[in-house]
Amino acid sequence: MSLRIYNTLSRDVEVFSPLLPGHVRMYVCGMTVYDLCHLGHARAMVAFDVVQRWLKVSGLKVTYVRNVTDIDDKIIKRAVENGETIRSLTDRMVVALHQDADALGIERPTHEPRATDFVPQMLSLIGTLEKKGLAYQTQSGSGQGDVNYAVRKFDGYGKLSGKSLDELRAGERVEVLDGKDDPLDFVLWKSAKPSEPDDAKWDSPYGPGRPGWHIECSAMACELLGESFDIHGGGADLQFPHHENEIAQSEGAFGKPLAGTWMHNGFVRVDNEKMSKSLGNFFTIREILAKYDAETVRFFIIRAHYRSPLNYSDAHLDDARNSLKRLYTALDLVSPAVVAIDWTNPFAARFKAAMDEDFGTPEAVAVLFDLAGEVNKTRSAELAGLLKSLGGCLGLLQSAPGSYLQAGAGLDDASIQRLIAQRADAKKTKNFAEADRIRNDLLGQGIVLKDSPAGTTWEVQS
């Protein structure tokens, strides 16, 4: 196949070929469900939704796993603060996650494992690492302590981040903490603390406790996709230490590459500053959807390449909304024909070439605008159908054009149609002052009237 993907591990764009012919197995790190999803989560979910959609368009079967981390220090803290069980909190946040993802047009993954359902597999993997001399347990004052991974016993540590152990050690505190053999060693199993609630603890050969974050993903990926699979993805912030540690765990245990291709989506910035709660520029998906329709948000994310930084601002969202409106306006001119995509068509061929080169959505979106321009000129139902179908490859342009262009108005359609009829009556009686008043009143509410020989239509002002 002609698809090429940038591999973080090799730092190069490589021809993609799945290990099992015709079948792609992909694991993407999902959310830690202690709070509502934010824009960074939206960026990752949309990016890998586009990846799995294009793989399917390319004729491949896709098994897509996106996990849910439902046990974590932040989750425990939030549940205690709320006076609720961990399961109550995480169940509620998973429902909210699904609502946000559905709103953004994100297809559900094949599997969405929750970490707490795979604790036996995590303990088994820790046992394998212990037998291979890659894991050791510390001793605490009260007895059994944490189980840690011995980083220096794994030869390939640092290959994903491109850092040597000495470089990594230079960034750490010199003293050995919590009984670790080395400051770089990371926890596989956290021993329970007396202050923690009972639902944050599991029995194990190492004493009561809970799994570390990194072992969760290694165990779930192996259980659902096998010891080696095709694509491992996540945000750029996960490259180190999370994904580096996954490699150490899985490859240390099984002696084979965890994933053939490592993909990382870029960071999100807000008005060219890092998004953070302390700066007051931290937005949940729901806060953004209160201001902008979901397809505009999806389009805003997609028109930037997944590896590039994404800069959020109201001006950029406004521009995305107006740009998407231009595409829908073309589809509103002529009813799109329902036809299969002809990949020999010059527009379709350009679109495919863009997507086959590391999921090049900026160029693919540019093709959509060129195609929309041709639809505007030719009024071709076939080209309109192609525009809608190519947009569908990205999860865009599937709403009824008229409905999309009218969405978001303060007045409902019936009220606006009554005013349009009153304006038409005023014009018939040559009461042009009244006709102008109605037009201007609607314009003041963000409704633009468009007169044509076929009658008057309306849309929301850009």
From Swiss-Prot:
Motif ('KMSKS' region): 274-278
Motif 'HIGH' region mapped to chain: 31-41
SUPFAM superfamilies per the UniProt record, alphabetical: Anticodon-binding domain of a subclass of class I aminoacyl-tRNA synthetases, Nucleotidylyl transferase
Cited CDD domains: Anticodon_Ia_Cys, CysRS_core
Cofactor note: Binds 1 zinc ion per subunit.
Pfam name, any one: tRNA-synt_1e
GO CC term, one of those recorded: cytosol
Reaction catalysis annotation: tRNA(Cys) + L-cysteine + ATP = L-cysteinyl-tRNA(Cys) + AMP + diphosphate
Keyword Ribonucleoprotein on entry: no
Compartments, record wording: Cytoplasm
Keyword annotations: Aminoacyl-tRNA synthetase, ATP-binding, Cytoplasm, Ligase, Metal-binding, Nucleotide-binding, Protein biosynthesis, Zinc
PANTHER family: CYSTEINE--TRNA LIGASE, CYTOPLASMIC, CYSTEINYL-TRNA SYNTHETASE
UniProt cross-references to NCBIfam families, sorted A to Z: cysS
Stated family: Belongs to the class-I aminoacyl-tRNA synthetase family.
Protein name: Cysteine--tRNA ligase
Species of origin: Polaromonas sp. (strain JS666 / ATCC BAA-500)
